A protein has these predicted regions:
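N-terminal subdomain of nucleotide-sugar transferases
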Residues: 1-41
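Phosphate-coordination loops involved in phosphoryl transfer and adenosine-cofactor binding
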Residues: 3, 91, 199-200
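Short, well-ordered coil/turn elements that cap or connect secondary structure elements
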Residues: 1, 29-31, 58-59, 111, ...
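Conserved nucleotide-sugar phosphate-binding/catalytic loop shared by glycosyltransferases and other
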Residues: 32-74
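A nucleotide-sugar donor-handling region in carbohydrate enzymes
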Residues: 42-46, 142-205
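Structural beta-sheet core signal
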Residues: 8, 36-38, 96, 118, ...
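Active-site and donor-binding regions of nucleotide-sugar-utilizing enzymes
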Residues: 7-10, 16-25, 51, 63-163
Length: 205
């Protein structure tokens, strides 16, 4: 039986964390051949390696090392470097998450008519000065399937004219990520280290 070839692209540490549980499922599925690509948008693999190890992820199949001087140069390098990878791998499906510059590699996949799945689709801040707002709109509108976290994100896409059959509400993958780390969280001594009282603090990022 022919396995479905799925390519997942990451480029930043938040993407690695959010996609970690899904990547593990894709890797474990006997019906899927999973190909992992790291664009190196912000950091090279060595500076991201701790996250791959912490979440029990293998080394990516392709390292694009696309980071360069300006954001525009980085985007250009990402598109140039993903192009031959797509030709070599010929994936059946292409998965990206969020609104980083790395997500714009979906443009190359679209040109090659590879089905695009966009997780965290439909998020909007309604501030055109924010570069990520442009990124997420581009990817939302070229994606074949938009995977939203919430009803309001789905509503935003519908208002922008996307058909309902291209939108699926999945919720956030962070629940699965946190559940997979439950034992490690329970063993953590970070509250003692920071002298914090349980349930008497909050985190701002």
């Amino acid at each position: 039986m022919k396995r479905l070839k799925v390519m997942t692209v990451v480029g930043t540490r938040p993407e690695i964390i959010r996609l970690s549980a899904l990547i593990q499922k894709l890797e474990a599925s006997p019906s899927i051949e999973h190909v992992l690509v790291h664009t190196g948008q912000n950091y090279d693999y060595e500076l991201n390696e701790v996250f791959f190890k912490d979440f029990n992820l293998r080394r990516p199949d392709f390292m694009l090392n696309a980071a360069t001087g300006t954001a525009i140069e980085t985007i250009g390098h990402i598109l140039i470097k993903i192009d031959p990878v797509l030709d070599e791998v010929k994936p059946d499906a292409f998965l990206v998450l969020g609104d980083t510059n790395s997500c714009l590699c979906a443009i190359a996949a679209k040109k090659k008519r590879i089905p695009i799945f966009h997780m965290e689709a439909g998020n909007r801040c309604f501030d055109q000065r924010v570069p990520e707002e442009t990124n997420r709109k581009i990817v939302d509108h070229i994606a074949d399937i938009n995977l939203t976290y919430s009803d309001i994100a789905r509503e935003y896409l519908l208002r922008e004219g996307l058909p309902p059959d291209r939108i699926i509400k999945t919720g956030s993958p962070m629940l699965e990520v946190l559940n997979s780390r439950r034992d490690d969280i329970a063993k953590s001594r970070i509250l003692d280290t920071l002298a914090l009282t349980p349930e008497q603090y909050f985190v701002v990022s």
